[in-house]
């Protein structure tokens, strides 16, 4: 399982001209599900996202001290199978991504676990399988790449 985690001042997802999800300050996370991913991979990614220390402490004297949970910020998750793109020349293949008919339930289970592990009202998401316009205002920018197979 892969995740691209971006610290944001705000982020939103629009589908067919309608804003379906938005957050204020927090994290916008692109989530890719691999064909061999398991529940343990999802739990690892969730734990890392919730506990990464990406913000300064309260008095601003120490960088990289506080997590999204400690800051009580929101998280916007967006499913992104293209994180598993394999390139051969200029053509990409997605054979390492989990099949859509399996990955949808896997993704929904991942979201449920994130809600149980944090605060349900702080977890937002896009629309699985939809063409989405994702807008964000980076904070920093701070961007972290995670891969559950590279622990």
UniProtKB/Swiss-Prot annotation:
One of its GO terms (biological process) is tRNA metabolic process. Keywords: Cytoplasm, Hydrolase, RNA-binding, tRNA-binding. GO terms for cellular component: cytoplasm. InterPro entries: Daa-tRNA_deacyls_DTD (IPR003732), DTD-like_sf (IPR023509). GO terms for molecular function: D-tyrosyl-tRNA(Tyr) deacylase activity; tRNA binding. Its EC number is 3.1.1.96. Disulfide bonds: none annotated. It catalyses: glycyl-tRNA(Ala) + H2O = tRNA(Ala) + glycine + H(+); a D-aminoacyl-tRNA + H2O = a tRNA + a D-alpha-amino acid + H(+). It is found in: Cytoplasm. A motif (Gly-cisPro motif, important for rejection of L-amino acids) lies at residues 140-141. Its main location: cytoplasm. An aminoacyl-tRNA editing enzyme that deacylates mischarged D-aminoacyl-tRNAs. Also deacylates mischarged glycyl-tRNA(Ala), protecting cells against glycine mischarging by AlaRS. Acts via tRNA-based rather than protein-based catalysis; rejects L-amino acids rather than detecting D-amino acids in the active site. By recycling D-aminoacyl-tRNA to D-amino acids and free tRNA molecules, this enzyme counteracts the toxicity associated with the formation of D-aminoacyl-tRNA entities in vivo and helps enforce protein L-homochirality. Homodimer. Belongs to the DTD family. A Gly-cisPro motif from one monomer fits into the active site of the other monomer to allow specific chiral rejection of L-amino acids. This is D-aminoacyl-tRNA deacylase.
């Amino acid at each position: 399982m892969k995740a691209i985690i971006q610290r944001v001042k705000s982020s939103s997802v629009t589908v067919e001209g309608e804003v379906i999800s938005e957050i204020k300050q927090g994290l916008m996370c692109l989530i890719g599900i691999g064909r061999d991913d398991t529940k343990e991979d999802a739990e690892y990614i969730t734990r890392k996202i919730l506990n990464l220390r990406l913000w300064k402490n309260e008095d601003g004297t120490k960088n990289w001290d506080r997590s999204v949970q400690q800051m009580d910020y929101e998280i916007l998750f967006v499913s992104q199978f293209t994180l598993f793109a394999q390139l051969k020349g200029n053509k990409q293949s997605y054979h390492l991504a989990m099949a859509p008919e399996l990955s949808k339930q896997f993704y929904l289970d991942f979201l449920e676990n994130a809600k149980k592990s944090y605060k349900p009202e702080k977890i937002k998401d896009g629309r699985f399988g939809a063409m989405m316009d994702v807008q964000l205002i980076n904070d920093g920018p701070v961007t972290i790449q995670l891969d559950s197979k590279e622990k």
